[in-house]
Amino acid sequence: MYSSNSRRAASILACIVSLTQLGFAQSPFPDCENGPLSKNAVCDTTLDPVTRAQALLAAMTLEEKINNTQYNSPGVPRLGLPAYNWWSEALHGVAGSPGVHFADSGNFSYATSFPSPITLGAAFDDDLVKQIATVIGTEGRAFGNAGHAGLDYWTPNINPYRDPRWGRGQETPGEDPFHTSRYVYHLIDGLQDGIGPEKPKIVATCKHFAGYDIEDWEGNERYAFDAVISDQDMAEYYFPPFKTCTRDAKVDAVMCSYNSVNGIPTCADPWLLQTVLREHWEWEGVGHWVTSDCGAIDNIYKDHKYVADGAHAAAVAVNAGTDLDCGSVYPQFLGSAISQGLLGNRTLDRALTRLYSSLVKLGYFDPAADQPYRSIGWSDVATPDAEQLAHTAAVEGTVLLKNDGTLPLKKNGTVAIVGPYANATTQLQGNYEGTAKYIHTMLSAAAQQGYKVKYAPGTGINSNSTSGFEQALNAAKGSDLVIYFGGIDHEVEAEALDRTSIAWPGNQLDLIQQLSDLKKPLVVVQFGGGQVDDSSLLSNAGVNGLLWAGYPSQAGGAAVFDILTGKTAPAGRLPVTQYPEEYVDQVPMTDMNLRPGPSNPGRTYRWYDKAVIPFGYGMHYTTFDVSWKRKNYGPYNTAAVKAENAVLETFSLQVKNTGKVTSDYVALVFLTTTDAGPKPYPIKTLVGYQRVKAIRPGERKVVDIDVTVGSVARTAANGDLVLYPGSYKLQVDVEKDYPTAGFKIAGKEVVLDHFPQPPRNATKA
């Protein structure tokens, strides 16, 4: 959405200029006490949000309504309705975007910068997700109250991380739809975190609906890409996070995506936006609205060529249920669309009612004294508790991938700090970042740990120059220990930039090999959202340890060194599969199928079993003994099934720390079957997880995992969610020798959720 693509640059620049001209000196809220709107019912707090929004619309002319269907809404000066920019970002903290203005210094010059979602996903800690989201929501409200942002934020990105080449996978918690659904439920609960659903603190926006996970791969650009997706894959993989976000978490906004799905641009698809989203998932609540991705209405006619011109594009989008245009098609062409009879005034009012009733719920039209969130201010931003939470998240999301006993490190001697991330600052934040109060680099953290440091970057992320090798090797030769900090960053993975290779870029592996030849203790710390093939590092005995840290953000250096030195033990798990580099030659990125086929070896851990490092893998500084309290559960009968979200059973594990180091343990519970429902059967499916904190040496803890009926069910070819009778096994963790528990389900197959069938043979509007 927010990229360096020149196609979007003009609108972004114009917005930033307009915000700069405003200077944020005026009040960001309408004057409902003495201004022109004070006599309008929109300011009457005794009325419901829809009635108040409709009163505002009744005072507006058609031209004024149309002007305010765009993201940088100009307001209505004659009514005292201020300009409002709907486009604020907060992926892992309040972030730079057209609607967010960081001051040059002093108040509102920074916000807490948490680890990227892929790093947070590796923690597998739902409570942590909610805590972080609550802080982001509070800081977002503070920025909004001060006129430094809006009150709605276009976050989170919950498209499952299907293909390892995707440039925006870093924005997601990982590849598994169950994990992503759990993540988004707790995230929305924290972000909106209001007194009740009718009084959210901020509005969150689940994006990008639907089937969006290609930027620009071998000439296939997101703006024109048609994602061909089966009903089965749609219901089983691409939809679940959005179903949870809307039906269960009750998010207040959704963003439709650039791409088409099965021939229809998502922002022009009434089946997606009305039949599925609003009707099937019962997301027709007050103030629930849909925005387009930025420029996506343009794409309807310019790239997808679904309709002939801007007027038809605007009409088909509003009619389908896209209420806001992050672009300029609506204000330019809605007047023409209405005059041509392509769009009715009631449909236009429906869109604006949704938008303004959302602002009513946020207290935008309330007197400050009547608004419980208006007191949130600068003192609530970047608090010590928030800073500690950012550090905790970076620690919890770090994953140990290899260790021959070298880790944890001793805190003495001279260490060579090498690699392109060795002194990285904003690189540690990943994308959609905001201005952080500070960023702990690896170099500064090493010095703070008391090491004597020799620093030499050696090479760049994607460099083929060896001019820095000699300095790096000399630093290593003069040190007791070598730590290489590298991986990937925005040079090779970003919005509008997919990878063509999943190997380590540039000559980083060459430098690591030469460092390992020195026979010094060598630890590699890998950064980036996407995985790179670590095969050569895993097989190289000269590489003694390997960590993945993702994008740990402001606390990155301190957090990574806490793990390296053993101040905290690692317990993160990979939230994605690490594929071999040849995987990209076996399946085109444009193939949306999950199941294996003639030109597709399968996607994600559920359908692919030749991983370099599997989904859910993560080592520890200690050892654990894990067992089931019972080996057999049930039997259960489908006749007793009541609802998809009902708990089938609470399965209990016993986890004992049999080593010498206090450590967290992430219990991952996978389901397998070979007879429940039709073939092919997935290799395994994640159905539950829990992060157990601080298990002391010798201590045993009981872990209760609630497994829902819907998690046990499978998706039929037509998209229906079906509970099948049969035999099932539960496996904990990714180690094949861990014990399993079993249960049986008797009875007849039961459809838990009837997938709304899309119209077939879609034609251009």
UniProtKB/Swiss-Prot annotation:
Glycosylation sites: 67, 107, 345, 412, 423, 464, 761
Catalytic reactions of this protein: Hydrolysis of (1->4)-beta-D-xylans, to remove successive D-xylose residues from the non-reducing termini
Keywords: Carbohydrate metabolism, Glycoprotein, Glycosidase, Hydrolase, Polysaccharide degradation, Secreted, Signal, Xylan degradation
Domain of life assignment: Eukaryota
Primary localization: secreted
N-terminal signal peptide: 1-25
Keyword Glycoprotein attributed: yes
InterPro entries: BXL (IPR044993), Fn3-like (IPR026891), Glyco_hydro_3_C (IPR002772), Glyco_hydro_3_C_sf (IPR036881), Glyco_hydro_3_N (IPR001764), Glyco_hydro_3_N_sf (IPR036962), Glycoside_hydrolase_SF (IPR017853), Ig-like_fold (IPR013783)
Pathway linked to the protein: Glycan degradation; xylan degradation
Record GO biological process: arabinan catabolic process; xylan catabolic process
Subcellular location: Secreted
Positions of the catalytic residues: 293
Keyword Secreted attributed: yes
Annotated Gene Ontology cellular component terms: extracellular region
First-tier enzyme category under EC: hydrolase
Residue ranges of the TM segments: none
EC numbers on record: 3.2.1.37
A Pfam family recorded for this sequence: Glyco_hydro_3_C
GO molecular function terms noted in the UniProt entry: alpha-L-arabinofuranosidase activity; xylan 1,4-beta-xylosidase activity
Function: Xylan 1,4-beta-xylosidase involved in the hydrolysis of xylan, a major structural heterogeneous polysaccharide found in plant biomass representing the second most abundant polysaccharide in the biosphere, after cellulose.
Family per record: Belongs to the glycosyl hydrolase 3 family.
Protein name: Probable exo-1,4-beta-xylosidase bxlB
Native source species: Aspergillus terreus (strain NIH 2624 / FGSC A1156)
Organismal lineage: Eukaryota, Fungi, Dikarya, Ascomycota, Pezizomycotina
